[in-house]
């Protein structure tokens, strides 16, 4: 297995810091992540999750829509040979490597370029995919660095055959409570997908002014009580800065009216989503990543993107609509030669997991899958 220069010097990951169960509801549901959905909002008196249960997930992380992703991308990977010889797949959100492992196994000559900003994910996936040897190249980067990663892997001249995005925070990241992504257990307010980046959730809470905090919560969390929450954050931090997820959850229970807490899931879910998106610049990265990915595809190459919340899916939908639109100037009665769409849609709108998959893998309940193929000669 080959590693990029940005990956070779990674440490084995930060040591876990002490965590303790919250005395508040213990849910692990986010509306935008690969975790089991729930329409319940536990009462404040609910039994807390134990640290061992929260930190360790013994259940296997089943890749979402795995068969459908293979079905959509396989034609692009087998144009030359049924074993994937000569083809390159970019897994732009490598995670634990579940999707990549399936592709490498099913197509025994396929080459993989795996991207992830999370050094822990790269180590875990690296171990999982080690048996595939030099067919695998891992690159530590955000997915908007896809063009540079492809160039570094000597594929820039020819392009790649298929690209897969599986967006959102992964189950693996949620399970590591010391990372601060989940609100079910008290832990440091971190939320960085890349432990080497500077901004943390605690810094957002402790340094953004009230107007900026409200904007983050309203835009990225679609939180209707954004102004009220932001005001209480500013008042509280004047006496004691925020340092743990438990402190934030406690404030959210005070800030959000009781009737609103009883519906729509855990009252912390929107604020935690908003902070995570802000800390990791997720939407900005995605807006850059999709056009860059479309550019590095070779003719007849395919791309599949799985989104788990409306903000991400809206960006994907917009970029895909532009890519499949005619380039003939509006108002002309016929399409000009060479001005047709650069891509064709492979899915009718966004596909969702069926009931059977959701029962087998509850993490797939909120997924939206869209896919395109690049028109030949483009």
UniProtKB/Swiss-Prot annotation:
One of its GO terms (cellular component) is cytoplasm. It comes from the Bacteria. Residues 43-54 have a biased composition (Low complexity). Its main location: cytoplasm. Signal peptide: none annotated. S-adenosyl-L-methionine binds at residues 97-99, 116, 143, 166, 173. GO terms for biological process: rRNA base methylation. It is found in: Cytoplasm. It catalyses: cytidine(1402) in 16S rRNA + S-adenosyl-L-methionine = N(4)-methylcytidine(1402) in 16S rRNA + S-adenosyl-L-homocysteine + H(+). Its EC number is 2.1.1.199. The keyword Methyltransferase applies. NCBIfam families: 16S rRNA (cytosine(1402)-N(4))-methyltransferase RsmH. Specifically methylates the N4 position of cytidine in position 1402 (C1402) of 16S rRNA. Belongs to the methyltransferase superfamily. RsmH family. HAMAP family: 16SrRNA_methyltr_H. This is Ribosomal RNA small subunit methyltransferase H. It comes from Mycolicibacterium vanbaalenii (strain DSM 7251 / JCM 13017 / BCRC 16820 / KCTC 9966 / NRRL B-24157 / PYR-1). The gene is rsmH.
